[in-house]
Swiss-Prot record:
Binding-site list for thiamine diphosphate: 98
Protein's recorded name: 2-hydroxyacyl-CoA lyase 2
Annotated family: Belongs to the TPP enzyme family.
Keyword Mitochondrion among UniProt keywords: no
Chain residue ranges for the region called Thiamine pyrophosphate binding: 470-550
Principal subcellular localisation of the protein: endoplasmic reticulum
Length: 632
């Protein structure tokens, strides 16, 4: 009796153990079945005879989203998608460095308001893009980066160029995904492109492994052994590989929606707009700072310009908003911004940010009422309650907000003496610039004078691409873009090397525009080889190099403060001859032909109009124009 009683708990324990083990086994089998897509394969078959490949799905989504250009540096991991894009009429433009491909996609995104797309190969191909992707993140550009990768089954097994690419790009991108099955290409890309444009725009990354892009017969050849297995373990491995292959391609070619998903764009509430209207209606000296976000869709640049003109508030323009009001508009002021901000009683930061560009908010007066509007809450409130405090903070689309302000302030007028005060200060500063242009320099040409002549020569249909430090910083004061979305600079990241990529994207987007690139000689070193790209693809752009044989923006502070010019010196290199060696046209400006600056610029224009990329190597001296210009 005791034995039977004692055996009961033991049997109960054993049966529980069996149930637990059985449940664990079932769960493991179900999990394996799910990972291998066994249930999905019951309803969706594999077309083993098809020669189609995943690159076709990639191209179809890009085409459905209106993508016209794909920038790349070729690699075996991504060949199928490049070929498929070409077949669908998407122009594939190959560069000499991957970073240029992403910069070009960035330019397309900024100028069109759509997603710019670049595709690069795995490993080093992707790591070469990191700077450009980070620049796009900080500049809030919707860029889609497509990256090749090792086959799904070979990742983490020592495959060629296989690294954890998702971990690398997750901090840089709004959306990161690795496609594991061909059928997932389309929905993943649609989600990525929507994410790039929703909220605060930014870059997104989609990883496309080899076996997802290549056709079934090629993947099968590499993945599943041709000889039938003999041993039990070999059969198990063969079964696993065969089902992995089937899962990759099951349902691959079934029709799916390919077009754009709805975007989520934040908007100011009517209550917020009304509070801002009331603040502005009481202003005596209002001022607007308009930044790049104001030019984002859905508000067109023309509609925004009309709204700003109707408001009648004096404004400063920055980033992509430069040129919004054209040249010499009575509401647009370019000089003495710091002094104007101190005097204004109401300041509207319309996409402008209180980072180093506004001295972290210290340029704002404590007595001013500050209205700040931005899609990104963190950026909107940066350094607030330290050096400045907003009266009204609006998280929403900037362009739409400005248009709504007009509706609430229709008929509002501000005293003309405020704008006149700002205009007089502008004119005094510009007179000082004219005087600096006449000052002699120790050697070569005065850069201030050269840039004034560039300003006088620049056509109305031009797009300005700027890439450099000292020379470009001087140009920002002297050269005016002729309209909105006609000034391309790196943005707040201050990246050198954007020039060739930005010029490439700009000329493709606006083939009827003249693309003028202003380079420092240091920055031009990054872009020189891409004149091979311009020549091969017949893309006529014009590069003006302010060649002062040095990293002058750094030198002008390093030498007086630290007593050494170490690492700041370059040479008066014959960049125009290097460009000629790549098949472009090259021209030289120096003191020997300083009376022909305009003629040489006109000659360069003519070369471009005839279809040739041109480099004008302008030997310049040094001035004190930008002493004390380094931001900390």
């Amino acid at each position: 009796m005791e034995t039977a009683v004692a055996a009961a708990p033991a049997w109960g324990f054993f049966s529980s153990f069996l149930l637990l083990a059985f449940g664990t086994l079932v769960a493991a089998l179900l999990g394996a079945a799910h990972r291998l897509g066994l249930f999905y394969q019951l309803m969706h078959k594999v077309d083993t005879a098809s020669t189609r490949h995943g690159g076709e799905n990639v191209a179809a989504v890009l085409k459905a989203h209106g993508v016209r250009f794909l920038f790349t540096l070729v690699g075996g991991h991504i060949s199928p998608l490049l070929v498929a894009c070409e077949k669908l009429g998407i122009r594939v433009v190959d560069t000499r460095h991957e970073v240029t491909a992403v910069f070009a996609a960035d330019a397309v995104a900024r100028l069109t308001g759509t997603v710019g797309v670049a595709a690069v190969t795995a490993g080093p191909g992707l790591t070469n893009t990191v700077t450009a992707v980070k620049n796009a993140q900080i500049a809030q550009s919707p860029v889609l980066l497509l990256g090749g990768a090792a086959s799904t089954l070979l990742q983490n097994r020592g495959a060629l160029q296989a690294i954890d690419q998702i971990a690398l790009f997750r901090p840089l991108c709004k959306f990161c995904a690795s496609v594991r099955r061909v059928r997932d290409i389309i929905p993943t890309l649609r989600a990525a492109m929507a994410a790039a444009q929703s909220g605060t725009p930014g870059p997104v990354f989609v990883e496309l492994p080899l076996d997802v892009l290549y056709p079934y017969f090629m993947v099968q050849k590499e993945m599943v052994p041709a000889k039938p297995p003999k041993g039990l373990m070999s059969r198990a491995v063969h079964w696993y590989l065969a089902n992995s292959l089937a899962n990759l391609f099951a349902g691959a070619w079934e029709p799916q929606p390919e077009g754009p998903l709805p975007l989520d764009i934040p908007q100011a509430s009517p209550q917020q707009v009304q509070r801002c209207v009331e603040i502005l209606s009481r202003a005596k000296k209002p001022l607007m700072l308009i930044g790049s976000q104001a030019l984002l869709p859905p508000t067109s640049s023309d509609k925004l310009r009309v709204a700003v003109e109707t408001l009648g508030i004096p404004c400063f323009l920055a980033g992509m908003a430069r040129g919004l009001l054209g040249r010499n508009h009575p509401l647009h002021f370019r000089q003495n911004r710091r002094a104007a901000l101190k005097k204004a009683d109401v300041v509207v930061l319309a996409g402008a940010v209180c980072d180093f560009r506004l001295s972290y908010g210290r340029v704002l007066s404590r007595s001013s009422k500050i209205i700040v509007v931005n899609r990104d809450r963190k950026e909107m409130l940066i350094n607030s309650d330290i050096f400045w405090k907003p009266q009204e903070a609006v998280q929403g689309d900037v362009g739409s907000f400005v248009v709504k302000l007009v509706e609430g302030l229709r008929g509002q007028m501000w005293a003309s003496d405020w704008a006149e005060e700002l205009r007089q200060a502008d004119q005094q500063k510009e007179q000082a610039f004219r005087e600096k242009a006449l000052m002699p320099v120790a050697q070569h040409l005065n850069p201030v004078r050269v840039l004034q002549l560039v300003e006088d020569t620049l056509p109305d249909n031009s797009i300005l691409v700027v890439d450099g430090g000292d020379f470009v910083g001087t140009a920002a004061y002297l050269v005016q873009p002729r309209g909105p979305l006609r000034w391309l600079d790196p943005g707040a990241f201050g990246t050198l090397g954007v020039g060739a990529g930005f010029a490439l994207g700009a000329k493709l987007c606006r083939p009827d525009a003249e693309v003028w690139c202003l380079f420092g000689d240091g920055a031009f070193g990054y872009s020189l080889i891409e004149f091979d790209t311009f020549v091969r693809h017949k893309i006529p752009v014009m590069a003006l190099i302010g060649n002062d044989a040095g990293w002058t923006q750094i030198s002008r502070e390093q030498v007086p403060s630290l007593g050494s010019n170490v690492a700041c010196g370059l040479a008066y290199t014959d960049y125009h001859k290097a460009a000629q060696g790549l098949g472009a046209q090259g021209l030289l400006l120096s003191r020997e032909n300083e009376d022909q600056v305009v003629k040489v610029l006109r000659d360069a224009q003519q070369w471009c109009q005839d279809g040739h990329p041109v480099v004008v190597n302008i030997l310049i001296g040094r001035t004190d124009f930008r002493d004390g210009s380094i931001a900390m």
